[in-house]
């Protein structure tokens, strides 16, 4: 069968009525991009329960995939973000990947490295990620998978960790969780100043939420670089806040947002950890493109800047100096959207 475009995605479709024996999915971008693939690949696992499903990713984002029950094998490339070292790692792994004789390769990265690996291991069927169309990353992932296997595997958010995952109860209790209280995750983690909703707005949102839902506690799962912001929120909220900044690893953070009643987040990997598990998630976007990066599913929503002449700008610092695309949303309005999502999820 010759290479062909399948539904406008570069692909060679699986030609057999029987199921493939061994499938390799490739994704080694940032943490959030990797998280997005998980519910769609679980859809593949549900469709082909007897096939081996392997995942090729990078070491720095491999912790969660390695703990997932849906993968039979996870291969992690080294090299951090150094292109040369990543190439060397890919070259070292390619002979072993070739020896496994994959029937299908789902190249959900579509980079020079992933294209090299895909071509080198010579699968009978394959597809390459649509990198540029104005669709969400989740939708492009779904369509890329369908182009290779010939059907829509859908999205399944019932992601499972081996052995039930880490003991997050012990971690939460150690830092002030009141057993039985709902967890509400606030994540002011945008990597640039332009992505930041005001810290005072997060504090006001938290106070309003707790006033209406007193059996709730706020959880912070920020990186150490955001410690000053976390400290300000934690001091303001007192016993109502569980500050796990720098204290929870990737797997623990994944498990906590999976249990949370609600997540409010700027554009970040944690935001994608949340919606991909079916947790009600409200994203706050400023410079980010909603059509590419917004959370998916009826349990998610996104407040973004696409209705403004200046947005989404892609700039690290607001050219007006006031982050007006985010500051226009008062805490009470955000709370209203948040409660709507949380109520719909419970219903």
Give the predicted meaning of each segment.
Residues 1-347:
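Catalytic machinery of carbohydrate-active enzymes
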């Amino acid at each position: 069968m010759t290479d062909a475009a399948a539904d406008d995605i570069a692909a060679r479709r699986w030609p057999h009525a029987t199921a493939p024996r061994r499938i390799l999915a490739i994704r080694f971008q940032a943490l959030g991009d990797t998280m997005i693939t998980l519910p769609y690949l679980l859809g593949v696992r549900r469709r082909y329960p007897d096939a081996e499903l392997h995942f090729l990713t990078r070491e720095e984002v491999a912790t969660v995939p390695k703990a997932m029950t849906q993968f039979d094998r996870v291969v992690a490339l080294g090299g951090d973000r150094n292109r040369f070292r990543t190439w060397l790692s890919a070259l070292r792994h390619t002979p072993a990947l070739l020896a496994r004789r994959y029937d299908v390769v789902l190249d959900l990265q579509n980079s020079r490295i992933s294209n090299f690996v895909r071509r080198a291991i010579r699968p009978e069927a394959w597809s390459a990620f649509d990198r540029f169309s104005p669709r969400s990353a989740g939708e492009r992932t779904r369509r890329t998978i369908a182009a290779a296997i010939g059907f829509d595997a859908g999205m399944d958010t019932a992601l499972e960790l081996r052995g039930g995952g880490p003991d997050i109860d012990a971690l939460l209790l150690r830092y002030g969780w009141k057993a039985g209280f709902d967890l509400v995750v606030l994540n002011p983690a945008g990597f640039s100043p332009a992505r930041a909703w005001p810290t005072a707005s997060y504090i006001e949102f938290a106070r309003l939420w707790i006033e209406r839902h007193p059996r709730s506690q706020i959880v912070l799962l920020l990186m150490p670089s955001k410690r000053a912001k976390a400290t300000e929120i934690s001091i303001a909220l007192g016993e109502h806040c569980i500050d796990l900044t720098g204290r929870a690893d990737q797997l623990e953070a994944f498990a906590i947002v999976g249990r949370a009643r609600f997540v409010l987040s700027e554009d970040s990997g944690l935001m994608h950890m949340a919606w991909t598990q079916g947790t009600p998630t409200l994203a706050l976007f400023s410079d980010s493109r909603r059509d590419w990066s917004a959370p998916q599913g009826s349990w998610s929503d996104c407040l973004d800047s696409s209705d403004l002449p200046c947005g989404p700008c892609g700039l690290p610092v607001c050219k007006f100096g006031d982050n007006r695309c985010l500051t226009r949303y008062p805490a009470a309005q955000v709370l209203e959207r948040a409660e709507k999502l949380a109520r719909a999820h419970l219903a």
